[in-house]
Amino acid sequence: MDNRTSKQNYYLDIADSVLERSTCLRRKYGAIIVRNDEIISTGYNGAPRGRKNCSDIGTCTREQLRIPSGERYELCRSVHAEANAIISASRQSMIGASLYLVGRDAATNELLSDAMSCAMCKRQIINAGIDRVIIRITPTEYRTIPVSDWVENDDSIFSF
């Protein structure tokens, strides 16, 4: 009998560690891209290189403007975890890969059971050639989303 952690939870555990580098004051996300059991890249949400992070300045623009979660991401100082992971990899290495995503509330550190890539990240994931996104729901449970679903159900990318 094999008592080892499943590969999915192994990679989700790594994404959970990556999110500890997040500088967002609202939500912390970690992402890793894996192809053929090899980690291609990692990413967490934070300001673009060389710019001040929300954690450095001690304020969140979206919070100051009372923008609800899931809206008006263009006003966010951060680059999302998925985007940072994609930026750090070559497209060739991502074709057919899986993206593992974990989100936590920055204040409570509780898992976000409803974590989901935003519309902008979904478009980047599609264009990167990634096949599926695995999102942690609980410490041992996850959901798998075939990226082809986002392509076939074009309107679903824009549902909020």
Model-predicted regions and their roles:
Residues R21-C24, I32-V34, S90:
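Short secondary-structure boundary/capping segments within folded domains
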Residues T5-S6, L12-D13, S41-F160:
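Zn2+-dependent cytidine deaminase-like catalytic core
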